[in-house]
Amino acid sequence: YQGDPKVTARCNDCTASIDRHIDARLPELQTAPDKSLLSVQMQAGLSDAQTRANIKLAISGGQNEPRDAIAGAAWALLHHREQYAKITARTHTWIDAFEEYARWMSPIGMSPRRITQDYTIGDITLPANARVFFMFGSGNRDAAAFDTPDQYNLSQSRAAAISFGAGPHFCAGAWAARCLIAEVALPMLFDRLPGLALCGDVAFGGWAFRGPLTVPVHWPVR
């Protein structure tokens, strides 16, 4: 989102390569459909362009957000031991740990939009074709909506959280993410590695996709 032509060119090359691989599979799936995401969309009547876009979204959403959310939620629980204690005491669950992290740190911090017509909000007029950025990270720390917006607190109500968007733009992968992270990754990590502890500083990076760059840990082998 910084307008770097080299980054843009690299991204365009990558998406074009994915499109070529998709196009190579389409004829085969037209005669021999299967249960793949690509085939299901074709059978549902989506256009080739829509199918390509959705496949690329699934590839991106299936690696960036889970990576950041798993590493970030693990760091949050190791850093805030009193919150992890709520899970071991069974007063709260792994889904609480994941959803509160997604609110507090917002693995998807921003989503771009294009204004289709002149629009006025308060005393600000947005002209048609203007580019705007919807800030999930800001909305998820709204002091008017959350009791302790800047704290990682499993006991906090998350009814107003927009970590997965809202309305017609609600994330199609939300339930898959909850299952992958809260039912598999986090409980497995803490069960398989008892005594896991942080052993260094953790830096976060990213804007649209935000998460820890590294999470150095120590695990005492018993």
Regions found by a protein language model. Give the residues of each.
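Cytochrome P450
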Residues: 1-222
